[in-house]
Amino acid sequence: MKRALVSVSDKQNLVPFVKGLVENGFEIISTGGTKRVLDEAGIETIGIEDVTHFPEILDGRVKTLNPYVHGGLLARRNLPEHMATLEKLNITPIDLVCVNLYPFKETIEKPGVEIADAIENIDIGGPSMVRSAAKNYHDVTIVVDQADYDEVLAQIKEDGETSLATRARLAAKAFRHTAAYDSLISQYLTKQTGLEDPEKLTLSWDLKETMRYGENSHQKAWLYEDALPKAFSVLQAKQLHGKKLSYNNIKDADEALRCIREFDEPTVVAMKHMNPCGIGRGDSLVQAWDRAYEADPVSIFGGVIALNRQVDLVTAEKMHKIFLEIVIAPGFDDDAFELLAKKKNIRLLTLDFSKKDEPTKHEVVSVMGGMLLQEQDMLKEDYHDWQCVTEKQPTEEQLKTLMFAWKAVKHAKSNAIVLANDERTLGVGEGQPNRIDSLKIAVKHAGEAIDDRTVMASDAFFPFGDCVEYAGQNGIKAIVQPGGSVRDQESIEMANKYGIAMVTTGIRHFRH
């Protein structure tokens, strides 16, 4: 008779699976709570202590760490000396292991969890059994996911055992399972110690979706989510309408969310190819939409739109007039949703914006042969901390407008320049190898909208005085920039020449 060892924390669909094993000639070894569930279901089981000849000790910390278990798992059936050892020691082979692990992830996700509770939910015996069974997959079937119950049972019913190919695949899955489990433990304990640069970095990600393709149609792509997901994320958004998000949709939506979380007043962000083409704010959402649209009515076509207020019908009627890829907001009024959903290709998503200021973990960027890890740029700034370096002092209204432009330029690709008034961006110049070209693009986009309220933000310092000179020649009245160039004085002199108020922040916001 074949033997299966069953010990799970997630008991969903367990009883039908084990009944199927029994019906196909397996006897069942089980432990603790799993044994109680199976006994109550009328399934005859063997207690683990009857196999190990040793009681559970230390409040269940030691149950299965025993040669009678691991010998039965690791013995190679095709080696006579292994089988002779089992016979000599009266160890019975174990042919199938069904194990999932203590709920460590669920424990550390609880608000205010104590480290002692987390420690008690670190499984030791479970991963050991999983690894032993997976190592010996030529002879042992390891099941760590209830999604595999039906396939395993079907093969056993058909052939009396699982195929070698299935066992190999399940073994690989089992090692991924334990690796991810250990990775979460490593991340948690590393965070508890405050270490920021561990010599070994382990990250755990769960496959969320296999994409149709990547950035281009010839590239394969997959979407993975952090095993401890962040609430304010496009991956946590609820899609109400439209086709699945593409690879590029997800990148643009992510960038739109990064940008809009900067703003508290009613704001609309239009994102295109991961660059803001229009940001508008107002006393109402429809006013913010009008201003974001006016910022660049050409580029917004086919854009990704993020709004930080529930979408009403008036705003929806205006959005409905143009083609948009995605609209993501805290919610939609019923009539607004009904109108927008008339276009089958638009994707409508909702997300809990109350979570936008939750601490964000690091961000990862891949490079060939490695990766870069950095904190996300979520620095909160106050314009009262800025330093005016010119003869002309900015007014309070100009400072507020400069802060709006400063938040916007933070999310444009470097070298980045944003021209704005107190209502919206007027022109965005981004991604140029030199800063003066970015400024010229921004001025071109702004056109005749430049007036006495127009200010300029630069994501990094001016290496020469040419940018400030060009700004002065085109009517810019105030500038915010980090400062710190060896030629800062050239820019200051140009600002004084054109009567520009210029402040420095001491903070750079490169984005690549």
UniProtKB/Swiss-Prot annotation:
GO biological process per UniProt: 'de novo' IMP biosynthetic process
Coiled coil regions in record: none
Gene3D superfamilies reported for this sequence: 3.40.140.20, Methylglyoxal synthase-like domain
Keyword Transport on entry: no
The reaction(s) this protein catalyses: (6R)-10-formyltetrahydrofolate + 5-amino-1-(5-phospho-beta-D-ribosyl)imidazole-4-carboxamide = 5-formamido-1-(5-phospho-D-ribosyl)imidazole-4-carboxamide + (6S)-5,6,7,8-tetrahydrofolate; IMP + H2O = 5-formamido-1-(5-phospho-D-ribosyl)imidazole-4-carboxamide
Domain MGS-like intervals: 1-144
InterPro entries: AICAR_Tfase_dup_dom_sf, Cytidine_deaminase-like, MGS-like_dom, MGS-like_dom_sf, PurH-like
EC code(s) of this entry: 2.1.2.3, 3.5.4.10
GO cellular component: cytosol
Alphabetical keyword list: Hydrolase, Multifunctional enzyme, Purine biosynthesis, Transferase
Molecular-function GO terms, alphabetical: IMP cyclohydrolase activity; phosphoribosylaminoimidazolecarboxamide formyltransferase activity
Alphabetical list of NCBIfam families matching this protein: PRK00881.1, purH
Free-text comment about domains: The IMP cyclohydrolase activity resides in the N-terminal region.
The protein, known as: Bifunctional purine biosynthesis protein PurH
Naturally occurring in which organism (per UniProt): Limosilactobacillus reuteri (strain DSM 20016)
Gene name of the encoded protein: purH
